[in-house]
Regions:
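Poly-acidic low-complexity segments
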Residues: 1-2, 235
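Conserved AdoMet/S-adenosylmethionine-binding subsite of the radical SAM
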Residues: 2-187
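C-terminal accessory extensions appended to soluble enzyme cores
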Residues: 154-240
Length: 240
């Protein structure tokens, strides 16, 4: 990381993110390695965000917390797509409530937590919005991110027949990680009303985890969504 020319060290530098494309706590043999890696990354002094859909032992959370250098250096996130159909859509994970309990344990250790409503499946997730909001408020989770659904034939098949998708809310969109690939995805403009509903219920909702990280640290988002007038910017007032 430090050898990357684009890496900026320090509190106001590059946000280090782990777990977006693979769960770092999925199996026991990866847990210790992941914890030790996060500790080494914390030592760099940069803001760090990592995520998991699995339950983490309190002793490991406490171990991590001891290395945090400043308030809000670390942001822990979990993901919820559905409360009622998680066994079908997210098999081999722990229940949404168990995931949020882990978020609460991080908060108890002084590490801010965030819930990714991601992917937000139009026709499924929106029908459970009140349940999700209730669960977040029950465990005092005050930050969440609503994420687009990227859909292919393989993904559609894996979701199963029980998952209903409102195809009217989809459009051709480029992947964030590769602008050369276009795939069916949720229209961001259709998600703004859900952002507003979370905020009306006292939950700070965004489209990007980096926005949560920037907000808790009161720094400009290095992704520059605000300055580029990007559709992901909700004009929360943080970036100046």
């Amino acid at each position: 990381i430090t050898e990357n020319k684009e890496f900026i060290a320090g509190k106001n530098g590059t946000i280090i993110s782990m777990g977006a494309w693979g769960d770092i706590f999925q199996t026991d043999r990866f847990i210790d390695m992941s914890i030790n890696l996060i500790i080494e990354l914390i030592k760099l002094g940069n803001p760090i965000q990592f995520m998991s859909k699995y339950k983490l032992d309190i002793s490991l959370i406490s171990k991590l917390a001891k290395y945090v250098q400043y308030t809000n250096q670390v942001l822990y996130s979990t993901t919820i797509t559905t409360i009622d159909k998680w066994k079908t859509i997210e098999p081999n994970t722990v229940s949404p409530e168990e995931r949020i309990k882990t978020c609460k344990e991080f908060k108890n250790q002084g590490i801010e937590s965030n819930v990714l409503i991601k992917p937000f499946i139009p026709g499924t997730t929106d029908l459970e919005l009140d349940k999700i909001i209730y669960l977040l408020k029950e465990y005092n989770i005050t930050y969440c991110v609503i994420g687009k659904l990227y859909i292919s034939d393989d993904i559609l098949k894996s979701l199963g027949k029980d998952c209903l998708i409102n195809t009217d809310a989809l459009e051709l969109s480029t992947l964030d990680c590769n602008g050369n690939i276009k795939i069916q995805a949720t229209q961001v403009k259709t998600l703004y009303k859900y952002i507003e509903k979370f905020r009306e219920n006292g939950i700070n909702a965004f489209f990007k985890s980096s926005c949560v990280n920037s907000n808790i640290n009161k720094t400009n988002n290095p992704s520059n969504y605000y300055f580029n007038n990007d559709e992901y910017c909700i004009n929360c007032g943080n970036c100046k």
